[in-house]
Structures are given as structure tokens and as C-alpha cells.
Design a protein with these regions (language model features):
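Bacterial N-terminal signal peptides that target proteins for export
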Residues: 1-9
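Bacterial N-terminal signal peptides
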Residues: 8-18
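Immediate N-terminus of the mature polypeptide
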Residues: 20-50, 54
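Residue-level signature of the cytosolic catalytic core of signaling kinases
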Residues: 27-30, 60, 123
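Beta-rich strand-turn-strand
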Residues: 69-71
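Mid-length scaffold segments of soluble, non-membrane domains
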Residues: 74-77, 81-152
Length: 196
């Protein structure tokens, strides 16, 4: 895990350094040809795999689908908390911390979103918003396989958010299939919420 974090940190720093060459507010697309190729690949993955799986997922009874979605949202609260601290938004950080504590203890590890019922609303943030607040430019436009379009800042920030996700530490000794299950569930859950 430490090697993974070191490699990602080096990549992250490389991407951040590359921002200095882009002072305008428009996102640059110097990789248009490869981005188009990856976009076509992602479309095929969506049509032949992700959409059919998401259709099946959406057939689950609503309480099960909601429970899975709630667990995934709950595991994101430590990421929200960390980023709000880095952004200097202490009130939002404490709200995220309280949501996590309440839903993890009284909400059956997040299956039930009790925090929402007592008016502690979810308010997502990520390291991309942190970097934006710190003044980092968006960088280049990238289309990432299996993920989709991102600015290079957003892509680098996704690596940081992944690194601080508590599930990585809870599942570090598990088989690969178990470690990727939350990410796969998140993708399927998000896709089923965006059916066209």
C-alpha cells in the first residue's frame, strides 16, 4: 500500500507542476486524438457492460438499492471531512464527521441514513475542489478508460481521494475481488441513477 501511495504522490506532484504552463481558464485538450479513442472505448464498455449491469441492479428492491447507496455515501464522509479541513471549512467538516459517526453507529454502518433524518444533509466535496480553492488550474482535458472525462487536476485529485478512502485500509488484506467491489458497486449505483 505504501508503494502505491508513493507512486501516486509522484504522479500527483508531476500533474500539479504541469499546471503552471496553463494560465487560462479554458481547459486544454492536447490529447484530443487519444481522448476520442478512449471515449469510444468507454462508450462500448457502457453499452455492453455497465448499462446492462445497471439495469439489473435497478431491479433490486428499493430498500436494498437505497441501503447500498447509503453505505457508499457513508464511506465517502471521511473524504469529505478531510477535504473540508484542507479547505478551511470547519463547519462542513464537522457536519461530515457527525454524519459519519451517526450513520456508522446508529445507522447500521450507513445502511440507514439517520443523519439526513435529523437534518444533517450530505454535502460532498473532494480534493479537486480543494485544489481549486488553493488556486490550482484545471490542466489538460483527459478521457480516462472506464472513468470518463476529467481535467488533469480532477484525475490527480481522484487518486488522492482514493488514497484517503477508509475502505482501502479496511479491505487491504482481502482478495482483489473484494477490494474492488465497493468501487464497482459505486459505478453501477451511479450509472443506474443516470439511466437514459
Amino acid at each position: 500500500m505504501l508503494k502505491f501511495l508513493k507512486i501516486n504522490l509522484i504522479f500527483f506532484l508531476f500533474v500539479i507542476v504541469s499546471y503552471s504552463s496553463y494560465g487560462n481558464s479554458e481547459i486544454s485538450d492536447p490529447y484530443e486524438k487519444s481522448n476520442r479513442t478512449v471515449h469510444e472505448f468507454n462508450d462500448k464498455v457502457d453499452v455492453y457492460f455497465l448499462r446492462p449491469v445497471s439495469v439489473g441492479y435497478s431491479l433490486l428492491p428499493n430498500p436494498i438499492e437505497d441501503g447500498i447507496s447509503n453505505i457508499l455515501q457513508n464511506t465517502g464522509e471521511p473524504i469529505n471531512f478531510t477535504n473540508y479541513i484542507l479547505q478551511g471549512e470547519i463547519k462542513n467538516a464537522l457536519s461530515s464527521l457527525m454524519r459519519f459517526v451517526i450513520n456508522s453507529t446508529f445507522g447500521l454502518f450507513g445502511v440507514i441514513d439517520l443523519a439526513d433524518k435529523i437534518n444533517l444533509k450530505q454535502n460532498d466535496t473532494d480534493f479537486d475542489k480543494t485544489l481549486e480553492k488553493w488556486g490550482a488550474e484545471e490542466g489538460n482535458y483527459l478521457v480516462i478508460p472506464f472513468i470518463g472525462p476529467r481535467s488533469s487536476r480532477h484525475f490527480a485529485s481522484s487518486i488522492v481521494d482514493l488514497a484517503i478512502n477508509p475502505l482501502n485500509y479496511l479491505l487491504k488484506d482481502e482478495d482483489n475481488i473484494i477490494r474492488v467491489t465497493p468501487t464497482a458497486l459505486y459505478a453501477v449505483s451511479a450509472r443506474s441513477g443516470n439511466m437514459d
